[in-house]
Amino acid sequence: HSGLLAIRQSIAAGVNITYKILYNDAVAMTGGQQVGERPEGHSVAQIAHSLRAEGVVKLVVVTDEPEKYHGRTHRLDSSAVRAGHPELINDLPPGVEVFHRDELDRIQRELREVKGCTVLIYDQTCATEKRRRRKRGKLATPDKTVIINELVCEGCGDCSVKSNCLSVEPVETEFGRKRRINQSTCNKDYSCV
């Protein structure tokens, strides 16, 4: 499961490649464990420092919450690392840029032009885990809900194509096929807007 060896080998071989690391706040298969709880755990910043130390040429973070990284770049005191205090590594390494997920396509295109091994860390909580936490009252439900008015919908399907969201579903009406948002599967991330 560890991709670190593959990244290390790509760097050693001088391969032009971009790795995408999904940091989704959940451990797959075994279910529901959080990641990065402990100081020696694997936060995005700690992963970024490890990759930078391995020799990754360019490293970026793409997230739906770029504001949580505001002020967390370029501040690492390397003496804290040498002194054996990995818990102090909570800032991103120098040169790591943070982008909103809306810029994912552009960032991927830029990274594929960079010579050497590059890494894109995508930081967003798993949508299924978010829905589970909302259902259990552990995560606040957003105040806004997206609804498609079937009486106004022209049935063109552009909203499905543009958002690429599975919750935008076709519905047959007396006026033909229209679209609606399935609220039970909606992640409330507003990617369809």
Language model feature labels by segment:
Residues 123-125, 129-136, 154-193:
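Iron-sulfur cluster-binding cysteine motifs and their immediate structural context
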Residues 1-13, 17-20, 47, 148-165, ...:
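Extended, hydrophobic alpha-helical segments in both membrane/secreted and soluble proteins
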Residues 1-33, 37-45, 105-106:
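Thiamine diphosphate
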Residues 2-3, 8-9, 132-134, 139-145:
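Glycine-rich phosphate/ribose-binding loops and adjacent secondary-structure elements
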Residues 27-39, 71-73, 77-81, 88-93, ...:
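Short beta-alpha connecting loops at secondary-structure transitions
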Residues 48, 55-136, 186:
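Structural signature of the thiamine diphosphate
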Residues 12-18, 24, 54-58, 114-117, ...:
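Short coil/turn connectors at secondary-structure junctions
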Residues 8-13, 49-53, 108-114, 155, ...:
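A general structural signal for short secondary-structure junctions and capping/turn motifs
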